Amino acid sequence: LAMTMEHKDRPLVRVILTNTGSHPVKQRSVYITALLDSGADITIISEEDWPTDWPVMEAANPQIHGIGGGIPMRKSRDMIEVGVINRDGSLERPLLLFPAVAMVRGSILGRDCLQGLGLRLTNL
């Protein structure tokens, strides 16, 4: 994944999430916008972006801790395929995750996802 941007810009990307579970769901895939965040350990999908019929389960560590304190979270019960959509419409090699789901302002692709995509953040 190669991306160049100005420092003032937020690194937002279009993402396709595909539920790989075997149970029936209304939507197998959804498109969202997510922030690339090298400061986040894990990928967190906003409850607003998460389809209501995609199952979640209690997480072993049920809180996300950050600057603002702790936020309750759950984990996807199914493995989710995460694909970043390039500006030309092509799709990066997708990866499989069990993302966290929480009431956050926007979805975040954390280091687990960035590493899986082979993305390296540098300053030129």
UniProtKB/Swiss-Prot annotation:
Active site residues of this protein: D37
Which segments constitute the Peptidase A2 domain?
32-113
Q: Which PROSITE patterns match?
A: ASP_PROT_RETROV, ASP_PROTEASE
Which gene does this sequence derive from?
gag
The record, for InterPro entries, names:
Aspartic_peptidase_AS, HERV-K_Pro_peptidase_A2, Peptidase_A2_cat, Peptidase_aspartic_dom_sf, Retropepsin-like_cat_dom, Retropepsins
- Quaternary structure and interacting proteins, as annotated: The protease is active as a homodimer.
Q: What is this protein called?
A: Proteinase p15
> Which biological process annotations from GO are given for this protein?
proteolysis
